[in-house]
């Protein structure tokens, strides 16, 4: 299987809450579309410093991360990030990789959105068994 990319929308989850509470107008929500590498070997969503800056996502902690090269680096973790793909969405934390690193869409947000990798078409798809809404087991 080759590399699989997906167009996803990233939104500042704090802005969504400010709109809900009436402190911000809906058109002020910081959001952007990005192309993410679908990476089932990564646990979390990983964004880069440029995206963090544009969305003004607050740092909630620091964590160590092991890169594909084996190198261990310390990264900021930002939250909340709302992530949208087709008719699916999830709210999650994101690791911030240095510079203009590639966005990685990891296993946890993939599972939460109930999306799958289609190996023949080499694309991310909505789970055909649950096409209208995400479904997960609670046992």
Model regions and ranges:
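Pepsin/retropepsin-fold aspartyl endopeptidases
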Residues: 1-139
């Amino acid at each position: 299987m080759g590399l699989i990319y997906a167009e996803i929308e990233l939104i500042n989850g704090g802005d969504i809450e400010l709109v809900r509470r009436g402190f911000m107008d809906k058109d002020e929500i910081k959001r952007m579309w990005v192309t993410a590498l679908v990476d089932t070997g990564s646990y979390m969503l990983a964004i880069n410093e440029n995206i963090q800056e544009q969305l003004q996502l607050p740092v909630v902690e620091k964590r160590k991360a092991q890169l594909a090269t084996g190198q261990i680096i310390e990264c900021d973790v930002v939250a909340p990030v709302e992530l949208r793909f087709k008719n699916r969405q999830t709210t999650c934390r994101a690791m911030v990789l240095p510079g203009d690193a590639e966005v990685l869409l990891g296993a946890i947000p993939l599972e939460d959105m109930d999306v799958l990798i289609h190996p023949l078409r080499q694309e991310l798809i909505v789970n055909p068994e649950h096409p209208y809404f995400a479904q997960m087991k609670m046992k």
